Design a protein with these regions (language model features):
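Alpha-helical transmembrane segments of multi-pass membrane transport proteins
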Residues: 1-304
Length: 304
């Protein structure tokens, strides 16, 4: 999925998605900020990596917003916040990781993140509308310009159909759908947009390898700590004593939110998953609650 996103960045698909979002809402109050949020939502539907989303969408939108007069701190925070959509809207690397740690089917974690991700997107749009209502905006795009931008973005917009349609139709596993998305991104770059070259494809491979190496270096350390916790029998003790302390399920959610918020402030979301999901999943099951509910709440707070 990361490779597909990087190829779409180098092959011109990401730029056309951003142009389409800008043509739709760029003239609204805070239009460029809203366009970045929507573009992040588009990108989330075929990539699923927070780092890749900031690289692809942020590098295009952030200079435009700064040039338009948006405050630099707001632009940076908005890009980082909107990138959280990559962890909720499928296909999400966070969903795949959660499924690997809890044995919940990937198709279910993908489905669980759709509505919360869209709700979060809507609230981000509302915040931008309120905070940036006095910033000057570009001229509204004409109907012809919007239609051209839609046609330009259409191959990229078709990518989520390939990924999610293949998974839910039972034709592809998540790994196979990621491979198909990568091939489709190459086809778009070489034959549809004709902006992808062999050199830029190699650059996309290098960027994919770099992002993947960062993620797996974090996973390696987090796995070591997780194994230490397991051999220390800490999770079973917590699960055993948590109800005995008179803790309710509502109190558990409050504790989970605080812990995830604190850890997510200082640590990448991947090690937070490895360190805490096994413990939280066991407690959730002890209360006879759904692990999908845990997934959505966990990602929402740990990703802040």
């Amino acid at each position: 999925f990361i490779f597909a996103g990087m190829v779409m960045l180098r092959g011109g698909a990401a730029k056309r998605l951003v142009d389409f979002a800008t043509a739709l809402v760029g003239h609204w109050p805070g239009g460029l900020g809203i366009a970045m949020v929507i573009a992040m939502g588009f990108f989330a539907a075929f990539c699923g990596s927070i780092l890749a989303a900031i690289t692809a969408v942020g590098t295009i939108m952030m200079p435009k917003m700064l040039e338009q007069g948006y405050p630099r701190p707001f632009v940076i925070v908005l890009a980082a916040s909107a990138a959280l959509l990559e962890a909720l809207i499928p296909p999400s690397n966070a969903a795949i990781l959660f499924s690997a740690l809890t044995n919940v089917p990937v198709s279910q974690t993908f489905a669980a993140g759709v509505i919360p991700g869209l709700i979060l997107l809507v609230f981000m749009v509302i915040v931008v509308l309120i905070k940036c209502r006095n910033i000057r905006n570009p001229e509204p795009a004409s109907a012809a310009e919007r239609w051209r931008s839609f046609l330009g973005a259409l191959p990229g917009l078709f990518t989520p159909t390939i990924i999610l349609g293949g998974i839910y139709a039972g034709l592809l596993t998540p790994s196979e759908s990621a491979a198909v998305a990568g091939v489709w991104a190459i086809v778009m770059g070489f034959f549809i947009y004709r902006e992808l070259t062999f050199a830029s494809l190699c650059l996309a491979l290098k960027e994919t390898a770099t992002i993947t190496a960062i993620i797996f270096a974090i996973i390696a350390t987090a796995t070591f700590l997780s194994v230490v916790l397991t051999y220390s029998q800490i999770p079973p003790h917590i699960v055993r004593y948590f109800p005995d302390m008179g803790a309710t399920f509502a109190l558990f959610w409050v504790a989970l939110a605080i812990i995830c918020l604190l850890l997510g402030t200082f640590v990448e979301i991947v090690p937070v998953f490895y360190l805490t999901v096994p413990i939280f999943a066991a407690i959730t099951l002890s209360f006879n609650q759904s692990l999908l509910h845990l997934y959505v709440v966990f990602v929402a707070f740990a990703g802040i």
